[in-house]
A protein has these predicted regions:
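Active-site-adjacent pocket-lining segments in enzyme domains
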Residues: 1-115, 119-131
Length: 132
């Protein structure tokens, strides 16, 4: 329906195609590129998504990926959904300067029984933000 900013251009391009025309080639906007990475990560292409984000962080909004994971974690009713949320949060954390996402990631890792990963995440927060 084009209600989300990152889907508006895709809807517009679909309409152009439905009218028998070809949309002009363009680079995806940062929000679109971020959602494309999230889709890839959730489809099992985590390493490829991680590599793409690391190669061009300026073309993405890692905060958007991270908050998508955070909201999925908050709404999760089972561990399968929590793991999907964690995938997104872990993808974003290295690129989000605020410590809150990393702290929430560590909390979710611990909740899922990934104690070593939680400890590693917290240690990284302390290195980047010793005031915490």
């Amino acid at each position: 329906t084009g209600q989300n900013p990152y889907s508006t251009t895709g809807v517009a391009e679909a309409i152009v195609r439905a009218l028998g025309r070809e949309p002009v080639a363009r680079q995806p906007f940062r929000d679109e590129a971020s959602m494309q990475l999230a889709v890839r990560a959730l489809a099992g292409e985590v390493d490829a998504a991680r590599t793409a984000l690391a190669a061009a962080p300026e073309r993405h909004l890692p905060q958007l990926i991270g908050i998508l994971g955070y909201y999925h974690a908050q709404a999760a009713t089972n561990d399968a959904v929590r793991r999907r949320a964690l995938t997104l949060m872990e993808l974003a954390v290295p690129h989000v300067p605020q410590p809150r996402l990393a702290l929430e990631t560590a909390r979710l890792q611990q909740q899922l029984g990934e104690t070593a990963a939680a400890r590693q995440t917290l240690e990284a927060v302390l290195q980047r933000h010793p005031e915490h």
